Regions:
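Intrinsic disorder/low-complexity segments
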Residues: 12-15, 413-414
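Flexible, low-complexity junctional segments that flank or bridge functional domains
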Residues: 17-331, 335-365, 381, 467-479, ...
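Sec-dependent N-terminal signal peptides
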Residues: 4-13
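Conserved acidic, small-residue-rich alpha-beta core segments centered on
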Residues: 151, 343-520
């Protein structure tokens, strides 16, 4: 027993990262030999793990890029200087799920307690990047509401968004040759890019523009309040409360029981809705939501799906029950801004959108039978210890089930790669799908399925994810031995059954409508308005 406790103690202590050590590594120049070893390591791991490494670039071209990179390193570099050299090579594979992360500064060990739970000055903002201009899309801060939706960011601590875009654009990619995802990806990553440029700071000064006026605004880091301070606030409120509870009539035991039961029932309903529809506490939104855009007509409905990661997949029973109960004639599925999620989620959804048996995807392609053991790579020591038995069994079962197809590819059967029937509550009437450049991964696969089966009319932008599939599924994160940069790699090629001859591009809309800066500032939705007008004219 003592040996077991000692083992767990050692694991815990070795897993506790030193901030000072991390910051020192951030500033340390790594030797040429060590960096060249990281280049070789990255290349070897990609060849070993990635099932479609040469989908959009040839083996010869990629080999040459890695060789040239190794030869071009002639002086020591910091981890982030090295990042700007190796990440463009990784992004040249043109797989949007595969990415590298920079090495970030953090608080020193001496101030670890002070900064624990604090939030970076920019962490409350979400953005839109339109025509090389950065706008605030959402400000979640409760304390500082000066910068609201529509405010243009001209610079942060003197760094212009366009300069940031030019510097970091080579370091990330979408799937294939499609460029529609790039502005959306940049908008999602822009805070991390500014953090990398500015370092660990307590405040930033933003130069902004709103309603034709330019101004400067300083935002400070938010610190978590101490328990002592919270107690003082509670005591103050208690002393200054307007109504003394002793002056109110006390409820009888029966009334108290009725009140408790009502509160319990209400909380139960709220909990059910949040769990099943995937409630996001940070943004106060649901992953899946049914809306009726015309107040006087319930026959037109919008199914807004923000992601396929949150909520229960069985929620579609509830959703399509609502659609049937309202005799919905026209269903608008809004997949804009949807980065993807679970394969079993979109597979489940597809069963409500077809009227005959179908196969949703092809079997997944992997590099070798032991590929799933790579899931342990990049995990902390405690995670490896506790996860090893489960991942070991899972990897063994999946590896044994893999078989070679007629082209010699090693493929793993999926639930979605078998014939399946529609659900009893399947929707068979008119479907419109709204897409944009952030319709990615699983959201692009369900789009390919509906487009390939001529099941829907598509309106908006070309999807960011390609028509013919993606490399994702399970994605371990590797840590390069010397630079300590992190590399995420997809292990499974997942392709929809429906395919197109044009490789490297997304699902293209039947009606192309790209929102303008004016649409964003005026909060108008031309794509949705087009569909609603078409439905109105048809009726």
């Amino acid at each position: 027993m003592k040996k077991l406790l000692f083992t767990f103690l050692v694991i815990f202590l070795t897993s506790c990262a030193s901030h000072d050590k991390q910051n020192k590594h951030h500033r340390t120049k790594i030797t040429v030999e060590a960096l060249q070893k990281d280049v070789v390591y990255t290349h070897k791991q990609l060849v070993k793990m990635h099932p479609d490494l040469y989908w959009y670039t040839s083996k010869e071209a990629l080999d040459k890029k890695f060789d040239s990179l190794a030869q071009s390193i002639t002086e020591p570099l910091t981890p982030n200087e090295f990042y700007h050299k190796i990440s463009p090579i990784v992004s040249s594979v043109r797989q949007g799920h595969m990415s590298m992360n920079m090495f970030q500064l953090t608080s020193p060990d001496s101030l670890k307690k002070k900064y624990k739970g604090s939030t970076h000055p920019l962490s409350h903002f979400e953005y839109e990047y339109l025509d090389d201009r950065l706008f605030i899309e959402r400000n979640r801060s409760r304390k500082d509401s000066i910068l609201q939706k529509g405010t243009e960011i001209l610079s942060i601590n003197g760094i212009k968004p366009i300069d940031l875009f030019k510097k970091y654009r080579p370091t990330f990619t979408s799937d294939g040759f499609n460029e529609t995802a790039i502005p959306y990806f940049f908008a999602r990553k822009v805070n991390s890019y500014y953090v990398n440029e500015l370092g660990f700071v307590d405040s930033v000064t933003i130069k902004a523009s709103c309603a034709d006026s330019v101004f400067y605004h300083t935002i400070k880091r938010t610190f978590k309040k101490s328990k002592r301070l919270l107690k003082q606030v509670e005591d103050s409120l208690q002393k200054n409360k307007i109504v003394d509870s002793d002056s109110l009539r006390k409820l009888s035991k029966k009334e108290q029981q009725i009140k408790r039961s009502a509160i319990k029932e209400q909380r139960k309903k709220q909990s059910f809705q949040k769990k099943w529809f995937g409630y996001d506490e940070k943004n106060k939104t649901y992953a899946k939501e049914v809306l009726f855009p015309v107040a006087t007509d319930s026959t037109t409905a919008i199914l807004k799906i923000r992601n396929f990661s949150e909520g229960k997949i069985k929620v579609y029973d509830t959703i399509f029950s609502v659609l049937h109960a309202n005799n919905v004639e026209d269903l608008i599925i809004d997949l804009r801004g949807n980065p993807g999620g679970r394969l079993n989620d979109i597979h489940r959804l597809s069963r409500y959108l077809n009227d005959s048996a179908f196969v949703f995807t092809q079997p997944a392609t992997i590099t070798h039978r032991a590929t799933y053991f790579n899931l342990l790579k990049g995990k902390s020591i405690p995670a490896q210890v506790f996860a090893s038995p489960f991942i070991g069994i899972y990897s063994l079962v999946r590896g044994v089930s893999a078989k070679r197809n007629e082209d010699g590819l090693l493929q793993v059967p999926l639930k979605s790669s078998k014939y399946i029937n529609p659900k009893p509550l399947n929707y068979t009437k008119n479907i419109y799908v709204l897409t944009d450049g952030m319709t990615f991964s699983a959201a692009a696969i369900i789009s390919s399925h509906l487009k390939g089966r001529n099941r829907a009319i598509f309106v908006g932008e070309e999807t960011g994810g390609t028509f013919n599939g993606t490399v994702a599924g399970v994605m371990p994160v590797l840590k390069l031995p010397h630079s300590k940069l992190k590399l995420r790699v997809g292990l499974m090629t997942i392709k929809p059954t429906q395919q197109t001859k044009e490789e490297g591009y997304g699902v293209k809309p039947d009606i192309y409508i790209k929102p303008t800066i004016g649409d964003f500032l005026n909060e108008t939705d031309p794509a949705l308005e087009y569909i609603l007008k078409e439905i109105e004219q048809r009726h």
